[in-house]
């Protein structure tokens, strides 16, 4: 007989709408509003990884373009059609697309919403590390405000886009070919797994960490 579903859920089961913060995220000295976040990882008791649900209204971005020395990051598009800003170029994304940013590569990134509709993202990364350093290629004024500036970031070729959401620049700066750090789960699934000696099929999955070269986070898309 199937177990009865419980009417009351434990504290580590929550809906993102009950956790969303106020719409005031911005950099010091700037009145530009960024994404609206819900800190899922912290609210659910996770201490080693950070997981956020983020909403991007039209014309906003998740952050200034940046690269980090010691913290990995992963972005999954739940809804909408944002652009991934990577090393000065825009790459269009859609629902089900995933982007991975290994630490220490100097790969500069941000997610921009140049569309007319809201975008929803699931963003995962490592919790803040004291040894982490950060670099803002388009905002050098941040250097004076931060003690964690990344001075010896690996050099990378930079494209012409300045990282600011601007629908008038969108078509001229958008790239056609995708980078290896952008994948859609629908083209990457592996056959359903099962335990040895048992023919019960489990979930059908995609190992994003392995595909992106992310070594300190285990990130999978699973379909049941």
Give the role of each language-model region.
Residues 53-58, 67-85, 124-126, 221-224:
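Short, conserved beta-strand element in jelly-roll/cupin
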Residues 88-103:
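Short acidic-glycine-tyrosine-enriched beta hairpin
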Residues 63-68, 110-113:
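Short histidine-centered beta-strand/loop micro-motifs
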Residues 58-60, 96, 104, 224:
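Tight coil/turn sites that cap or link beta-strands
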Residues 74, 81-83, 90, 108, ...:
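Structural motif
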Residues 1-48, 136, 140-221:
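A short, N-terminal "cap"/entry segment at the start of jelly-roll beta-barrel domains
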Residues 103-131:
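Ligand-binding loop in jelly-roll beta-barrel domains
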């Amino acid at each position: 007989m199937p177990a009865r579903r419980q009417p009351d859920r434990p504290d580590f089961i929550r809906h993102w709408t009950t956790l969303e913060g106020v719409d005031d995220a911005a950099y010091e000295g700037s009145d530009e509003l960024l994404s609206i976040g819900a800190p899922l990882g912290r609210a659910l008791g996770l201490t080693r990884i950070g997981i956020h649900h983020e909403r991007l209204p039209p014309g906003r971005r998740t952050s200034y373009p940046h690269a980090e020395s010691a913290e990995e990051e992963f972005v999954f598009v739940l809804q909408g059609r944002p652009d991934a800003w990577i090393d000065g170029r825009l790459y269009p994304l859609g629902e089900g697309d995933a982007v991975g940013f290994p630490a220490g590569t100097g790969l500069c990134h941000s997610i921009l919403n140049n569309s007319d509709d809201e975008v929803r993202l699931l963003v995962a990364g490592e919790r803040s590390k004291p040894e982490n350093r950060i670099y803002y290629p388009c905002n050098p004024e941040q250097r004076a405000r931060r003690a964690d500036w990344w001075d010896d970031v690996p050099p990378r070729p930079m494209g012409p886009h300045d990282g600011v959401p601007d629908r008038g620049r969108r078509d001229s700066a958008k790239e056609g070919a995708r980078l290896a750090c952008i994948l859609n789960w629908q083209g990457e699934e592996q056959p359903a797994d099962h335990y040895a000696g048992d023919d019960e099929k489990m979930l059908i999955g995609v190992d994003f960490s392995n595909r992106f070269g992310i070594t300190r986070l285990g990130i999978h898309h699973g379909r049941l």
